[in-house]
């Protein structure tokens, strides 16, 4: 009886600790928090990132800022 209760408690605690990982992974594939505390929007929980590509590059850009 004691062993099963301890197992259930350990399972619940481990699930609650890993609950935030899938949500962070959905937001741009980033799991680790950015350095700035203001980098995540508290209402939408999405990470704010600035785009370095020019606006006319719809498919993204290379490192030298040329469109793909």
Swiss-Prot record:
One of its GO terms (cellular component) is extracellular region. Contains 2 disulfide bonds. Keywords: Disulfide bond, Secreted, Signal, Toxin. Residues 21-50 form a propeptide. It comes from the Eukaryota. Residues 1-20 form the signal peptide. One of its GO terms (molecular function) is toxin activity. It is found in: Secreted. Expressed by the venom duct. The cysteine framework is C-C. Belongs to the conotoxin L superfamily. This is Conotoxin ba14a. It comes from Conus bayani.
């Amino acid at each position: 009886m004691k062993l099963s209760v301890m197992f259930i408690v350990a399972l619940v605690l481990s699930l609650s600790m890993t609950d935030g990982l899938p949500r962070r992974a959905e937001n741009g594939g980033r799991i680790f928090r950015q350095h700035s505390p203001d980098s995540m929007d508290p209402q939408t929980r999405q990470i704010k990132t600035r785009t370095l590509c020019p606006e006319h590059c719809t498919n993204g850009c290379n490192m030298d800022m040329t469109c793909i």
